[in-house]
Amino acid sequence: MSLSGLLPPNLGGNSPNADGNLTPEEKAALQQAKIIGYMNRISESCVFKSSMAGVLGFGLGGIFGMFISSLDLQHIDPKIYEKPFREQIRIQARDMGSRSFSTAKNFGLLGLIYSGSECCIEAFRAKTDIYNAIAAGVFTGGALAVRSGPKAIVLGGAGFGLFSYGIEKYMHWGE
């Protein structure tokens, strides 16, 4: 990234102050350029990307969980309707909150693992192509199914890898 537009015109090597005697304005511009460079490096790191995906996945999962739990009425005990209205609202709100939190955790973990693995694979291969997403999908599917045994790991990896392939093909449809 070029910072030439952010620096004063006399900050280069042919400046009258090239010996290190910078004006306060030039020092401030140089410091600002360094800070912008640090911020760019931090925001492009795999840790930052995967953390943001986890946080945003948690938020989106909470919204989805709240919506889905409001539609699912089959698990509610019919005896709830015999209770006072406030008690019904309290019970349903507690259930909605717990299910929303559970979905939020799952979405957050999914976003964290997928984006972190895709970023690491991309950095290792030094390429940006569809194979990064497929490999990250296989890794994520397997990692999420690790508690269920080897067959679930293989099926989860294959399924999520195929899903990642489909999403990537859809996203790059016209290219």
Curated annotation (Swiss-Prot):
Its main location: mitochondrion. Disulfide bonds join 46-119. It is found in: Mitochondrion inner membrane. The keyword Oxidoreductase does not apply. It holds the Pfam family Tim17. Residues 1-23 are annotated as: Disordered. One of its GO terms (cellular component) is TIM22 mitochondrial import inner membrane insertion complex. It is a multi-pass membrane protein. Residues 1-17 have a biased composition (Low complexity). The chain crosses the membrane at residues 51-71, 126-146, 153-173. Keywords: Disulfide bond, Membrane, Mitochondrion, Mitochondrion inner membrane, Protein transport, Translocation, Transmembrane, Transmembrane helix, Transport. It comes from the Eukaryota. The keyword rRNA-binding does not apply. One of its GO terms (biological process) is protein insertion into mitochondrial inner membrane. One of its GO terms (molecular function) is mitochondrion targeting sequence binding. Essential core component of the TIM22 complex, a complex that mediates the import and insertion of multi-pass transmembrane proteins into the mitochondrial inner membrane. In the TIM22 complex, it constitutes the voltage-activated and signal-gated channel. Forms a twin-pore translocase that uses the membrane potential as external driving force in 2 voltage-dependent steps. Component of the TIM22 complex, whose core is composed of TIM22 and TIM54, associated with the 70 kDa heterohexamer composed of TIM9 and TIM10 (or TIM8 and TIM13). Belongs to the Tim17/Tim22/Tim23 family. This is Mitochondrial import inner membrane translocase subunit tim22. The lineage of its organism: Eukaryota, Fungi, Dikarya, Ascomycota, Taphrinomycotina.
